């Protein structure tokens, strides 16, 4: 659609910021992208989180956002570089000492999520933006100030270093019609937005650190370069920690150890003191059986000692905008822990929803610039109203999924509910029944609606279970009471009464 040209400033050149710039540029706006780091395509640039390889799970929401960017080459590229993961592969050890693998498909209909290298996707988006004449990059520029009432921002150019280290780099002033903040969890745009908007803000570091490891490609097999199945997200679950592995195109796997800070301290201390009984390989053999056959013990130690041990942050805030001048998206608005694989997907979806709402309000304007600004203000207010509830919902789901991944995947109750919901999805499709994971990862309905529907399904299953157990118990209790009215009958009725009480308390507790 043809729109009036505006100057859009995007702060942050990661995947979310780059997609936002692509959306804006496709609408004919003049786009300037400001990035704190150097060009992310330069190998010398320090990557996100100081790691070289971050594999992510790309699902329908992220793909849908890229489809709406009207860049068929982008979708073709994604199809060519991603690896489909159809489910989880749970690793463990049986009581007899034998190792096992157990596949758990994500979806009974055979749908998959895609493993993709974050850096490669980012580079591709930047390459596409560089081809557009109305896009300009400003790398090594730090946002130092903003006046969102006057639509002005100030950036420090770190490229122009001074001879005196105490002197500040040169600062430039930038005018804009509209700013999009996509500069991550520690967002400078959000920091300055708080000075203009009465923003509610909540930040939490969970008691879990993460460290990256690598499983190298196979050099001995002529059939496959992958040493374990490439079409699964591999999980070594533990009650308090877990180890995961995600495939890469070169045959390697990017692995992550998630564990409480106390565990990391113990392993670090063992490394310093040379305590072999609690060393890193012994820890892996005890809790993640089979990993030391995929990563040599010496490599495990080296990677643990070399790669950073990083925290996980969860952020909620509202609103996401001020007036008609600024909005935040992605981690700047809702940083979440990575356990649902939705962080990047939610950020990319932010962009699609934001521009859908902007387009809707743009159709209500004419050439009057003041009317244009007022409509954009209404659009940003609508975006905040719509998106906050969904962002908070997926933020909570991500925290809950950590428990599922590290322990519930082994639970018979978890497997029973998943199997029953999938059976209903296939054999009684008129009910519209789906697992929560399928709704989140393979659909585009609002996260908040997914939560509501999943809770309703859980209540129905619980009532059905209670009905299936409780009615036979009631019939049995009445039979015993009338058949044996003496002491035996009273004793049997007492057992029945207590059991029914437990069922009722279970229902009451679940509803709360």
Curated annotation (Swiss-Prot):
<dbReference type="GO" id="GO:0006569">
    <property type="term" value="P:L-tryptophan catabolic process"/>
</dbReference>
<keyword id="KW-0662">Pyridine nucleotide biosynthesis</keyword>
<keyword id="KW-1000">Mitochondrion outer membrane</keyword>
<dbReference type="InterPro" id="IPR036188">
    <property type="entry name" value="FAD/NAD-bd_sf"/>
</dbReference>
<protein>
    <recommendedName>
        <fullName>Kynurenine 3-monooxygenase</fullName>
        <ecNumber>1.14.13.9</ecNumber>
    </recommendedName>
</protein>
<dbReference type="GO" id="GO:0004502">
    <property type="term" value="F:kynurenine 3-monooxygenase activity"/>
</dbReference>
<comment type="similarity">
    <text>Belongs to the aromatic-ring hydroxylase family. KMO subfamily.</text>
</comment>
<dbReference type="GO" id="GO:0043420">
    <property type="term" value="P:anthranilate metabolic process"/>
</dbReference>
<dbReference type="GO" id="GO:0070189">
    <property type="term" value="P:kynurenine metabolic process"/>
</dbReference>
<dbReference type="GO" id="GO:0071949">
    <property type="term" value="F:FAD binding"/>
</dbReference>
<keyword id="KW-0496">Mitochondrion</keyword>
<keyword id="KW-0274">FAD</keyword>
<keyword id="KW-0503">Monooxygenase</keyword>
<dbReference type="InterPro" id="IPR027545">
    <property type="entry name" value="Kynurenine_monooxygenase"/>
</dbReference>
<dbReference type="InterPro" id="IPR002938">
    <property type="entry name" value="FAD-bd"/>
</dbReference>
<dbReference type="GO" id="GO:0034354">
    <property type="term" value="P:'de novo' NAD biosynthetic process from L-tryptophan"/>
</dbReference>
<dbReference type="Pfam" id="PF01494">
    <property type="entry name" value="FAD_binding_3"/>
</dbReference>
<keyword id="KW-0285">Flavoprotein</keyword>
<comment type="pathway">
    <text>Cofactor biosynthesis; NAD(+) biosynthesis; quinolinate from L-kynurenine: step 1/3.</text>
</comment>
<keyword id="KW-0472">Membrane</keyword>
<comment type="function">
    <text>Catalyzes the hydroxylation of L-kynurenine (L-Kyn) to form 3-hydroxy-L-kynurenine (L-3OHKyn). Required for synthesis of quinolinic acid.</text>
</comment>
<keyword id="KW-0521">NADP</keyword>
<dbReference type="GO" id="GO:0019805">
    <property type="term" value="P:quinolinate biosynthetic process"/>
</dbReference>
<keyword id="KW-0560">Oxidoreductase</keyword>
<dbReference type="GO" id="GO:0005741">
    <property type="term" value="C:mitochondrial outer membrane"/>
</dbReference>
């Amino acid at each position: 659609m043809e729109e009036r040209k505006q100057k859009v400033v995007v702060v942050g050149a990661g995947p979310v910021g780059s997609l936002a710039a692509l959306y804006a540029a496709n609408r004919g706006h003049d786009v300037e992208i400001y990035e704190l780091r150097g060009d992310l395509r330069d190998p010398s640039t320090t990557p996100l989180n100081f790691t070289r390889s971050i594999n992510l799970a790309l699902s329908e929401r992220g793909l849908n956002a890229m489809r709406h960017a009207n860049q068929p080459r982008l979708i073709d590229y994604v199809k060519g570089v991603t690896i489909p993961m159809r489910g989880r592969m749970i690793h463990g050890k049986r009581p007899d000492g034998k190792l096992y693998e157990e596949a758990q498909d994500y979806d009974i209909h055979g749908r998959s999520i895609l493993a993709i290298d974050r850096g490669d996707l980012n580079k591709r988006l930047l390459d596409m933006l560089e081809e557009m004449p109305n896009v300009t990059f400003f790398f090594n520029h730090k946002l130092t100030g903003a006046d969102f009432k006057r639509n002005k921002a100030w950036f420090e150019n770190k490229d122009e270093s001074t001879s005196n280290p105490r002197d500040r780099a040169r600062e430039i002033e930038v005018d804009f019609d509209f700013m999009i903040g996509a500069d991550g969890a520690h967002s400078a745009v959000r920091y300055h937005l708080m000075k203009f908007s009465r923003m509610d803000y909540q930040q939490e570091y969970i008691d879990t650190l993460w460290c990256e490891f690598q499983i190298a490609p196979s050099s001995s097999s002529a059939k496959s370069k992958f040493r374990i199945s490439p079409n699964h997200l591999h999980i070594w679950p533990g009650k308090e920690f877990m180890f995961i592995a995600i495939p890469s195109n070169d045959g390697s796997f990017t692995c992550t150890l998630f564990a409480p800070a106390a565990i990391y301290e113990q392993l670090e201390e063992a490394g310093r003191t040379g305590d072999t009984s609690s060393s890193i390989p012994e820890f892996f053999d005890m809790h993640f059986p089979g990993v030391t056959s995929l990563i040599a013990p010496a490599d495990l130690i080296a990677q643990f000692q070399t790669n950073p041990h990083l925290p996980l942050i969860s952020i909620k805030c509202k609103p996401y905008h001020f007036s008609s001048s600024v909005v935040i998206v992605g981690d700047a608005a809702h940083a979440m822990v990575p356990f649902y694989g939705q962080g990047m997907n939610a950020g990319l979806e932010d962009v699609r929803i934001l521009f859908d709402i902007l387009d809707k309000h743009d159709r209500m304007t004419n050439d009057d610039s003041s009317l244009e600004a007022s409509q954009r203000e209404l659009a940003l207010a609508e975006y905040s109203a719509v998106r906050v509830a969904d962002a908070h919902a997926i933020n909570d789901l991500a925290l809950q999924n950590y428990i599922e991944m590290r322990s519930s995947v082994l639970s018979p109750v978890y497997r029973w509910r998943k199997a029953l919901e999938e059976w209903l999805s296939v054999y009684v499709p008129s009910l519209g029944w789906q697992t929560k994971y399928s709704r989140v990862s393979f659909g585009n309905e609002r996260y908040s609606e997914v939560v509501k529907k999943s809770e309703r399904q859980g209540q129905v299953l619980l009532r059905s279970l209670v009905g299936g157990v409780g009615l036979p118990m009631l019939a049995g209790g009445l039979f015993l009471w009338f058949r044996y009215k003496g002491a035996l009958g009273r004793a049997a009725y007492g057992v029945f009464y207590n059991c029914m009480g437990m069922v009722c308390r279970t229902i009451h507790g679940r509803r709360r």
